[in-house]
Amino acid sequence: MAPTSSFPHQGLYVITKEGSSNIDLLRAHVQGALRGGARVVQYRAKRAAHPLLEAQALLEVCRTQGVPLLINDDIDLCLKIGADGVHIGHEDEKLKVARNRLGPHAIIGVSCYNSVDRALSAQEDSANYVAFGRFFPSSTKPNAPQADIDTLTLARQELSVPIVAIGGVTAENGVMLLEAGADLLAVIEGVFGAPNPEAAARRYNQLWSPT
């Protein structure tokens, strides 16, 4: 499979909230985030009632805006709807399986938590980007391992693929993550937990395009 959109080198990376059963609301929230400047959308379907329908709806939205849609940890769903790629855990074999099944042009991102060595291994095994975190307290994954901001600096020196920072990222603390070496900031609650996802996305987007 070949993605219709390439993975960006910087910008806001939004991840949908789990457990939503309203496809129209999910679509509207993602549309708002894209209007606000989001550059990547990841769909998380672990507790979704209708993952296929939701993913198809979001793919249509993302295609319209020329933004890649990635599926969280579900290669089958990615293939079924023709999404641009997947985001997976750090397991070496899972990355190899994903690349074999999705092909050389699919976008594949890997969670590396606080390990630059893991990120280097993922890069060597053809990951298109790596993600580190959580950096700050997170309501989505409160028990996720803590990552050190210094990890971003070391990763920036060692890696050539884009670096994503995740975990409790706000428009305020995101500055230090970008200064430390992150290229993209991944956000869930900060955008989709806000009253106005479009306005929230715009606030984050100012970190790359200050006025």
Give, region by region, the residue ranges found by the protein language model.
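C-terminal binding/interaction regions
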Residues: 180, 184-187
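Conserved N-terminal beta1-alpha1 strand-loop-helix module at the mouth
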Residues: 1-92, 100-128, 144-147, 154, ...
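Conserved sequence/active-site signature of Rossmann-fold short-chain dehydrogenase/reductase
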Residues: 135
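Phosphate-binding beta-alpha-beta segment of Rossmann-like dinucleotide-binding domains, i.e.
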Residues: 132, 140-145
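A short, polar/charged loop-to-alpha-helix boundary motif
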Residues: 93-96, 138-139
